[in-house]
C-alpha cells in the first residue's frame, strides 16, 4: 500500500488528534445519539452503499463488529472526495484499501486517476467523431457515384487498363481500430463494393460506336429525298395513295405524258418520212418498256397512231389525186384526242390533266 495513503488514513488522524474514545466507538458500534446532540452522524449502511454502488452487489448489513466511520464533515479530505464527481469508481479497490485509506488517497494518485479518466473520455469522443466523419465520407462517395452513373448512363464507361477493375476500399480503413470501428469498416467495405459493382456494370457495357461520316451523308440524302418525294406528291397527287412507289409511278407517268405532248406538238413541223419512222420506232420502244402497266404508255400509243396517220397524210399530199381526210385531226385543231378522255373513268387518271387557269383545250 502506498505510504502516503497510510499517512493520511483516518486511524492516524484520529490518534494524532488525541481522541481516546475512537476505539470505544468502534467496539460499541453505532448507537443512537443523545438528545443534546444537534447533528446525527450517518450510519455505516447509510453512506457506504451510496459511495460504492459498483463494488457491492447488495447493501451490506451493519453488525456490532463493523467499524463506524466518522461523519463526512469531520475530515476535509473525505468531504472533498464525496464532492468530486469526475473520479472513476470502476477500479477494483479492496475492502482494506477502502477502510485503511483508499478513500483518503494522495493528491498525486487523485490527479493520475482524473487524468486517466479524462483521457478515456477524450479517446471515446475522438472515436465517435471519427466514425461520424467516415459516415459522411461514405455518403458523399455514394452521392458522387450515383451522379457519375447517371451522367455515363447513355455513353458508357471505359475502364483504364492500368487500374484494377474492382478496387476495394478496405485498404483505407485502419485495422487496429476497436470493435466499433471494425463494424463500421465492414459497413464501408460493403457499401464500396456495392458502388463498385454498379460502376463495373456500367464499365462492362460497350460504348456506342461513333457514327461515320458516310452514314451522316446518307441521312442527309434521305432527308433531301424525302422532301423531294413530298414535293412530287404535291404535284402528281395520286388518288388516296401516299407511299413512295405510287408517287414515283405517278411522277413517271406524268413525265411521259409531257414528253408525248411535246412530240405531238412538234410533229407537224417535221414532215420528213425519216423523222416519222424515228418517232414510230421510239413509240414502239416505249411500248416495250420496263413498265408495261404504266398508264403513260397509252399516250405513247396515241403518238404512234398519230405518227402513222401523219405519214398517211403525207402520202396523200404526195398523191394529189387522192382526196384528203376532212376531220379536225387532219387540220391540227385537236391536240388531245378524245380517246385520252376515257382514262378519267379508269382507276388511275394520271395521264389526264386539267388545263391551266384561263386556257381551254383546243
From Swiss-Prot:
CC terms in the record's Gene Ontology section: nucleus
Subcellular location, principal: nucleus
SUPFAM superfamilies: HLH, helix-loop-helix DNA-binding domain (SSF47459)
Keyword Transcription regulation set for record: yes
Compartment list: Nucleus
Keywords in alphabetical order: DNA-binding, Nucleus, Transcription, Transcription regulation
PROSITE patterns membership: BHLH
Covalent S-S links between cysteines: none
Domain bHLH stretches: 209-258
InterPro entries (alphabetical): bHLH95_bHLH (IPR045239), bHLH_dom (IPR011598), HLH_DNA-bd_sf (IPR036638), IND-like (IPR045843)
Keyword Transcription: yes
Assigned protein family: Belongs to the bHLH protein family.
Name listed for the protein in its UniProt record: Transcription factor bHLH133
Organism: Arabidopsis thaliana (Mouse-ear cress)
Gene: BHLH133
Amino acid at each position: 500500500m502506498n505510504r502516503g495513503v497510510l499517512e493520511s488514513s483516518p486511524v492516524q488522524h484520529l490518534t494524532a488528534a488525541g481522541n481516546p474514545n475512537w476505539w470505544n466507538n468502534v467496539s460499541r458500534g453505532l448507537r443512537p445519539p443523545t438528545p443534546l446532540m444537534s447533528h446525527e452522524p450517518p450510519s455505516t449502511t447509510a453512506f457506504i452503499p451510496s459511495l460504492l454502488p459498483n463494488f457491492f452487489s447488495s447493501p451490506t448489513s451493519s453488525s456490532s463488529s463493523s467499524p463506524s466511520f466518522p461523519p463526512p464533515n469531520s475530515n476535509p479530505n473525505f468531504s472533498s472526495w464525496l464532492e468530486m464527481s469526475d473520479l472513476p469508481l470502476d477500479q477494483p479497490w479492496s475492502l482494506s484499501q477502502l477502510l485503511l485509506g483508499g478513500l483518503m488517497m494522495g493528491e498525486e494518485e487523485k490527479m493520475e486517476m482524473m487524468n486517466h479518466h479524462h483521457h478515456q473520455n477524450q479517446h471515446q469522443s475522438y472515436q465517435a467523431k471519427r466514425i461520424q466523419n467516415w459516415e459522411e465520407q461514405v455518403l458523399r462517395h455514394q452521392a458522387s457515384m450515383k451522379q457519375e452513373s447517371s451522367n455515363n448512363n447513355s455513353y458508357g464507361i471505359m475502364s483504364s487498363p492500368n487500374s484494377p477493375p474492382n478496387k476495394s476500399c478496405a485498404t483505407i480503413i485502419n485495422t487496429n481500430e476497436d470493435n466499433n470501428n471494425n463494424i463500421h469498416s465492414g459497413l464501408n467495405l460493403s457499401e464500396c463494393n456495392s458502388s463498385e459493382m454498379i460502376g463495373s456494370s456500367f464499365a462492362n457495357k460497350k460504348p456506342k460506336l461513333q457514327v461515320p461520316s458516310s452514314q451522316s451523308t446518307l441521312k442527309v440524302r434521305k432527308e433531301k429525298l424525302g422532301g423531294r418525294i413530298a414535293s412530287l406528291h404535291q404535284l402528281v397527287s395520286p388518288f388516296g395513295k401516299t407511299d413512295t412507289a405510287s408517287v414515283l409511278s405517278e411522277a413517271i407517268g406524268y413525265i411521259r405524258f409531257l414528253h408525248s405532248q411535246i412530240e405531238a406538238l412538234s410533229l407537224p413541223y417535221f414532215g420528213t418520212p425519216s423523222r416519222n419512222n424515228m418517232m414510230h420506232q421510239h413509240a414502239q420502244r416505249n411500248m416495250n418498256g420496263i413498265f408495261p402497266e404504266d398508264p403513260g404508255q397509252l399516250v405513247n400509243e396515241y403518238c404512234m397512231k398519230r405518227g402513222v396517220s401523219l405519214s398517211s397524210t403525207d402520202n396523200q399530199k404526195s398523191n394529189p389525186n387522192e382526196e384528203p381526210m376532212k376531220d379536225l385531226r387532219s387540220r391540227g385543231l385537236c391536240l388531245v384526242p378524245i380517246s385520252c378522255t376515257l382514262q378519267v373513268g379508269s382507276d388511275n387518271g394520271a395521264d389526264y390533266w386539267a388545263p391551266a387557269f384561263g386556257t381551254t383545250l383546243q
